[in-house]
Regions:
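Periplasmic-binding protein-like
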Residues: 170-177, 295-316
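An extracytoplasmic/periplasmic, membrane-proximal ligand-sensing/linker region
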Residues: 198, 310-356
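Ligand-binding pocket segment of bilobal, Venus flytrap-like solute-binding proteins
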Residues: 188, 193-261
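A bilobed periplasmic-binding-protein/Venus flytrap-type ligand-binding module shared by bacterial periplasmic
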Residues: 144-151, 264, 272-285, 304-307
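Early extracytoplasmic/lumenal segment of secretory-pathway proteins
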Residues: 40-105, 356
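A structural signal for short loop-to-beta-strand junctions that line the ligand-binding cleft
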Residues: 90-95, 113-145, 161, 171-174
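Short beta-strand->loop
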Residues: 47-50, 131, 147-149, 155, ...
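Short helix-loop capping/hinge motifs at secondary-structure junctions, enriched
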Residues: 150-158, 190-199, 283-289
Length: 356
C-alpha cells in the first residue's frame, strides 16, 4: 500500500511539474474514483412510510447477513413530493410504502426503475407486482368485516355487497371512504361489478351507517364493543394488534367483541391490499437496494412479517403464521392489484358523490 501511494505521489509530481493540468485532473479523478469504490461504505438508503417498529427488525437482520447498513428516513406523508423535489440528487435508493395507490404514484411520476430479478419474479406472483416490475408487494392484508359476536351471526353476511342491504340500516361503522384502504376496496367492487353498481352500493352503504365516517380501523372495533354499531370494515392486521396489545389492554376487549368475516368466498374472493417497495431510478446504491428488496421476499423475512405484523406473506411458499391461520383460511381476490390503483380516481369520484 505504501509503495502504491509513493508511486502515485511521484506521478502526480511529474504531471504537475509539466503543468499539464488536464492530465492531472484526469489522473486524479481516476485514482480518487478507484479508492472511493474500494473503500465506499456498503449501505442502502430507504425512504419509508412504514412505522419503524414494523420494519427495523428486518433491516437489522439484513445487515447481519450482508454487512450492508440500512439508513432509514421514516415519514407519515410527503415522501413522493420529497423525491420529486430532490430529483437526481435524492439519497433514496428504496421506497417502502403501504397501499397500492401510493406505490403507483411513484410509477406514475416516473420515479421507480424496472428491476430484472429472477428472485423477485419467482417469489412474487404476477398479480402482486407491477406489470413492468417497478414495484413488488412484500405483504398482504385482507380488508374484512368485523361483526359483533353478540349481535350478528357470523354467517349472516357472505359478500361485501351485502352491506348495501337495508336490513343493516344504522348498524355499520367505517372510517372515511376517501382513506386509501376504503378507496381501494371500492375500486375492487368497480372492477367486479362496474361503476354504476359500485356507486349504488356505496350510496346504500352510506345510508346504512350508524354514524358519520370517522376514526381509524381500531376505532370501528371500539364502536362495536360500545354498541354504537354491529358491523365494521377493517384490515386483518388490526385484529392481531388489538388482540395482543399490552400497552393499551382495553383494545384486547375490543378484539374479544368481534368476529372476522372473510367476504365473497363463493365468488371472486376477499379484497386484499398490499405493502410493497420499489427501487428509485436515481438510486446511488441500486444493487444494495435490489438485494434488500429480494431479502424481504425470502422465507425468513416473509415469516417475520406474518409473526410480527399480522400480515399475510406474498411468497406462496411461505405459510401464514399460527395466529393468522387460527382466523381461518380464505380465498383472496386475485385481481391484479395495480388495477386497484387505476380505478382509484373513479372510486374517489363515487366517494365524493355519495358523501362517504
Amino acid at each position: 500500500m505504501l509503495g502504491s501511494i509513493t508511486l502515485i505521489i511521484s506521478i502526480l509530481e511529474s504531471v504537475v511539474m509539466k503543468k499539464n493540468l488536464v492530465k492531472f485532473l484526469v489522473f486524479f479523478g481516476l485514482i480518487f474514483g478507484f479508492y472511493e469504490s474500494v473503500y465506499a461504505k456498503s449501505e442502502v438508503n430507504v425512504y419509508s412510510y412504514r412505522q419503524p417498529i414494523l420494519i427495523n427488525p428486518f433491516f437489522e437482520e439484513f445487515t447481519k447477513l450482508t454487512g450492508i447498513e440500512v439508513n432509514v428516513l421514516h415519514a407519515k406523508k410527503g415522501l413522493l413530493e420529497r423525491v420529486l423535489a430532490e430529483g437526481n440528487n435524492t439519497q433514496a435508493d428504496l421506497i417502502l410504502t403501504v397501499d397500492i395507490a401510493r406505490l403507483s404514484q411513484f410509477v406514475q411520476n416516473d420515479l421507480l426503475m424496472e428491476i430484472n430479478s429472477n428472485t423477485l419474479t419467482q417469489n412474487i406472483p404476477s398479480y402482486l407486482r407491477d406489470s413492468n416490475n417497478k414495484w413488488f408487494a412484500l405483504s398482504k392484508r385482507a380488508r374484512v368485516l368485523a361483526v359483533s359476536k353478540e349481535r350478528v351471526a357470523q354467517d349472516s353476511i357472505k359478500n361485501i355487497e351485502d352491506l348495501a342491504d337495508s336490513k343493516w340500516k344504522g348498524k355499520i361503522c367505517t372510517r372515511p371512504g376517501s382513506h386509501d384502504y376504503n378507496r381501494s376496496l371500492l375500486a375492487s367492487i368497480i372492477a367486479a361489478n362496474g361503476e354504476a353498481k359500485a356507486e349504488e352500493w356505496a350510496s346504500n352503504l352510506v345510508a346504512n351507517l350508524a354514524r358519520k365516517p370517522e376514526g381509524n380501523d381500531r376505532a370501528q372495533a371500539k364502536a362495536i364493543h360500545e354498541g354504537v354499531c354491529d358491523i365494521a370494515v377493517m384490515n386483518t392486521y388490526y385484529f392481531g394488534k388489538m388482540k395482543f396489545n399490552e400497552k393499551n389492554p382495553e383494545q384486547k376487549e375490543w378484539a374479544k367483541s368481534i368476529n372476522i368475516v372473510f367476504t365473497n368466498q363463493d365468488n371472486r374472493g376477499n379484497h386484499i391490499n398490499v405493502a410493497g417497495g420499489g427501487v428509485v431510478k436515481y438510486a446511488k446504491n441500486k444493487a444494495n437496494a435490489i438485494a434488500l428488496l429480494e431479502f424481504l421476499t425470502q422465507s425468513d423475512a416473509q415469516t417475520l412479517y406474518a409473526t410480527m405484523n399480522y400480515e399475510y406473506p406474498v411468497n406462496p411458499s411461505v405459510s401464514p403464521s399460527k395466529e393468522l391461520s387460527s382466523w381461518g383460511e380464505f380465498k383472496e381476490d386475485k385481481l391484479p392489484v395495480e388495477r386497484l390503483a387505476e380505478l382509484a380516481p373513479t372510486a374517489q369520484k363515487i366517494i365524493d358523490r355519495v358523501g362517504w
